[in-house]
Every structure is written in C-alpha cells, then in structure tokens.
Amino acid sequence: MINFLEYSDREVLVSQVTQTLASDLSSSIEERRNVIFSVPGGSTPGPIFDKLCEFDLDWKRVSIILNDERWVPENSERSNTKLLRERLLIKNASDATYISMFCDALTPELGIPKLQQQIESKLPISVLLF
C-alpha cells in the first residue's frame, strides 16, 4: 500500500525527507557492517543531497548507487554521477563509496556482467530514495 505524504512547502519536504533518510541510514549502519543507499539522479533530489551530506553518519560504511543512471561517461554533462559528486559525495558524505553504473563497455548490455559482479557483492539495498 502506498502512503502519500503532504508537506506544506518544498522546504518542509526537503527537511523531513532528509531527516528520515539520515535516520534510516543510521539504523541500517547500526544493524549491518556495510549499507547500500540507492538514489535517483536529476535535479529533484539535489536539495535533499545538499542537507544529507552534512549529517554526521559513519559514511565510510555507506555505498551509494544511482537507480537511474544514463549510459554515458561519468564526466558527461548528462551523467547523474556529476550531480552526486557535486551535491552528495561532499562534506561528511565524502567518505561514502560510490558504485558506478557505467563501465567501458560499448553498450549497457555488454556492461552487465562487469556491473553485476560489482553490485552483487554490496546487496541488498538498505535505504532507497526514488
């Protein structure tokens, strides 16, 4: 069942979602040795990332993976990795590990074996933002 939450404005939404994510990450870190945090790209989660990166968590135990990356090199302006590097993988969260969803294969299909091997060892996903 989906539970829709309403917020009075964008600032309240960002604050409350960020607080919930930080709490969920903290709980996951307490329960597991390492956690995986799956996040979307694009500009929408940017304000959340701006605040979340400041939380005092054991970021060294957090691996971050995009759940909607494009098949473009990470340095491309179209890559969601750029957003993560600029807005989430900074400040306290700079200690987190980033799991890339891109490799040197010509197509996503050809890259699956390499990416699958890299990702499977980190599963399951502990906290998901979508």
Tell where the protein language model's regions lie, with residue ranges.
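A glycine- and small-aliphatic-rich helix-loop capping segment at beta-alpha/alpha-beta transitions
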Residues: 51-59
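Ligand-binding beta-strand-loop-alpha-helix segment within the catalytic cores
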Residues: 60-127
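Short amphipathic alpha-helical segments
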Residues: 49-52, 77-78
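Glycine-rich beta-strand-to-loop/alpha-helix junction loops that act as flexible
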Residues: 39-44
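N-terminal glycine-/serine-/threonine-rich phosphate-binding loop
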Residues: 1-37
